[in-house]
Amino acid sequence: MKARVLELLAENSGADKRDLARLLGLKGSDRIQLKRVLKELAAEGVIEGRKRTGFTRKGELPEVAVIRVTGLDADGEMLAAPLAWDSNEEPPTIYVTPPKTGGAPGPGDRLLARLEPVGGRSSPRPRDSGDAYEAVIIRKLEAASPSRLVGVVRESPQGARLVPIDKKARGEYAIDKADLGGAKNNELVAAEPVHGRIAGFAKVRVVERIGSMDSPRTISLIAIHDHGIPVEFPEAALDQAKAAQPIDAKGRTDLRSVPLLTIDPPDARDHDDAIWAGPDPDHDGGHIVLVAIADVAHYVTSGSALDKEAIKRGNSTYFPDRVVPMLPEELSADLCSLKEGVDRPCLAVRMVFDAHGHKKSHQFLRGVMRSAARLTYAQAQSAFGGNPPAGMSALVKTTLAGIWEAYRSLTIARGKRDPLDLDLPERRVVLGADGHVASIAFRERLESMKLIEEFMVLANVAAAEALEKARTPLIYRVHDTPSKEKLFAFADFLRTLNIAFAKGQVVQPGVFNRILKASKGMPHEAVMSDVVLRSQAQAIYDPANIGHFGLNLAKYAHFTSPIRRYADLIVHRALIRAFGLGDGGLTDKEIAALPATAEHITMTERRAMAAERDSTDRYVAAFMQDRVGDSFDARVTGVTRFGLFVRLAESGAEGLIPIRSLGADFFRHDEKRQALVGERSHTVFRLGDVLAVKLVEAAPITGGLRFAIMDGRGGEGAAMPAHRPGRPHRTPKRSKAAKPARNKADKRKFKPKKS
């Protein structure tokens, strides 16, 4: 009977005992057996029973449920989550079908909806297959009211308006003159909703004046306020930082005679790592590598005001014009920073490698160091190439030679490890003396950067291995293997390029590297790294270790940047505790809180990434304002139901070609091919295509760029702005051309990952 009950629940989710008895044809005492079967299935965790919605298969939603809209995914699909979810597992993804009439719901809105699993209720859908539901709205139960809005004040003959900075915002808001709080036209403000409407616009009241949009420094402030990044330090934390004193070398290993070097970008705002390497006298061809890291734990003790603010921030956040530090500048830019020629406390690891780059041993120590030189990547690279900068001392030249020799052997082991090797050009915003954007360029990728990365990775591995061997709890940096859903989508795309990729294989980073190598010289080479990146999971912090897929490492933790990452500070405290390195070790209270801490700092890291990305987008949009109407070569980097994302060849600036600007044809979104296909013209726009485009709109407030195709394949004149100034706060109707059939279980989020 168990199998039959499960079949019926698959076809009739939410059926209660009476429904099941009727479907099974059971009467009288025969129902007792059904009751026993239901109890057994519930005890086995196979089904769930709810008072109002009856029985469902474990992890399944009923046919009708109340859901809350949570936002949009990278493809513009509206997402929702069930209000009632009793399972310990993550709820399945719900895609909301926009209503045919009336305004679309927004984030926070509660909906009564009919839910249908993608593929049907009777299809087998294991929990790890990326379950998804499609929701058809029955009625809207409650409209959401944002508690805080950030936007720009615009004066008009009809009165003041608030233009939200969020690209996804559904229109403008009205501001009564009495609610302006002194804010002027073109001023960035924070506002809160108030009761009432003016000429169809919802009303808001200004609660904070942030800055004038005429000032270039306001661009970063938009992202800071939009993402809720803490800026001001509490007085107690500032007082502790100001009271901090230089360390006493007593009780520490003296490393001041070792010519440790810092190698950083020219605009580095903190220096938390220094390196030295030389030949190992005990192993022919081997090397000793010393990585010294700022001893932040000496100054930031558990439970202190500094510590509470540091964990709240989670990490430093970097913008083109400023940094929002995790620690006050008295520490981050001074006492903790490994300045040239100044005594500084450090936590160091001494690693011994053989001639092939395999680690023989490691040892952690708490010391005092004195940096022999502060170098930039370019200076180190010149020295490695035999052309050291003028004035470089013989000691520094000799030290760099030893570092380079060690790196050459370490690359042998790295090559065998075969970590994921992506070529992802990074935009760099160059500001002029006046704070405005002087240029947008790509960051140069030097071998000296790879050297520092390799030294840091090895130090991080040593920290994880040492703590695990000492049985001391820690927070790992983990990166899961790609999900089946993403691998299947990746395989489907590769098949359209005649590249073989077995869906059922056990993947390793080397599999992706071979595909990247095979793509060299092919038309799709420029986007293959992006496609591989999108197939990956996001790295997170977790006290439970699952390894790091991208780096192809079994054990990995963040140890090398405690000035700017709280995760590293936790690892430092764990090392101090594990090896009896003095005061400031990890406490029992901190150990108990590690799961919550890991979850929190994962959130703050993603918050910082989003803020940094949004700020860069706004700087780029401001820079491109003067080039509206110009034409460019662009490559398609993303294909969605609502248009094409493109990247300009000359600057890396990214924007959207709306599907409505592609002409009168009906374009179907082919997810497997990553293409938009014209039903009548058979015109195809594919990922990786190079197009001639014209910049139609640049919006510094939101950071959006809008393009139109110039090569005759699209209808430039059909381009429409996402929002017309002066429209009330509501959702525009979606173009019919953006509603083709799609497989919603095959969604992919296009977001950057970090190691």
Kindly give the residue locations of the regions a language model identified.
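Charge-lined substrate channels and their catalytic hotspots, especially those that engage the 3′ end
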Residues: 1-290, 297-342, 374, 379-384, ...
